[in-house]
Amino acid sequence: STVMTAVSNCFMQKRLIRYVTDEIHAGQDVLQFGTADGGLQHAVAEKMNGSGVYHIEDISKPQIDALLPSISPWLNVRLNVRDFSNPTDRKYDAAVLFFTLHELPDARKEIVLKRAFDALTSHGKIIAVDYAMPCAYHPIKHPLRLFNRLFEPFAESLWYKDIKSFAPANLRESKNIIWAKSTTFGGLYQCVIAQKR
């Protein structure tokens, strides 16, 4: 959304992007669910430095087309118009969900997280950056709640449910997956890493 994106752009964008780029290395294959505002794609492509494959999917062809100029210098970037729930045979070292889940109904959140896990290599990871519940004293908590209810009806569930809770049940408690969560900006944003081992 315009207002929420403006908040992140003004105050936190570089830090939020760094959550992703800190987890990615040159030579890896990366799958990104949805195009993102701002400099995410540029930062990821730069970090990968032309090696590995950076695959970006979005259900919207106009969004994909709009992204072309910003990623054109990197030949390892692949763009695809695709429904997130459609499986792929290719396996990736990292799956990125950057402000994707809050746009989806809870049932779709579950489908997309399952697809993300299914797309990982045996030691791959999911990197999910999205909104979370701001702390009680956060100055924009109550205006944001009203805004969400009017314009982002699927965002508020991330206030009350962990991203982990949308993963398939067998993966939530699996000893073969390490879950880590951190928050920033008074709890407004979260980063969840799910690392296979």
Residue ranges and their predicted role:
Residues N9-G27, G39, A43:
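Conserved alpha-helix/loop element of class I SAM-dependent methyltransferases that forms part
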Residues L31-S85:
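Class I SAM-dependent methyltransferase SAM/SAH-binding core
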Residues S85-A95:
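A short acidic, Gly/Pro-enriched loop at the edge of an enzyme's catalytic core
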Residues E110-S122:
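A short glycine-rich, Lys/Arg-flanked "PGG" loop and its adjoining helix->strand segment in the class I
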Residues V192-R197:
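C-terminal lobe and adjacent flexible extensions of AdoMet/dcAdoMet transferase-like proteins
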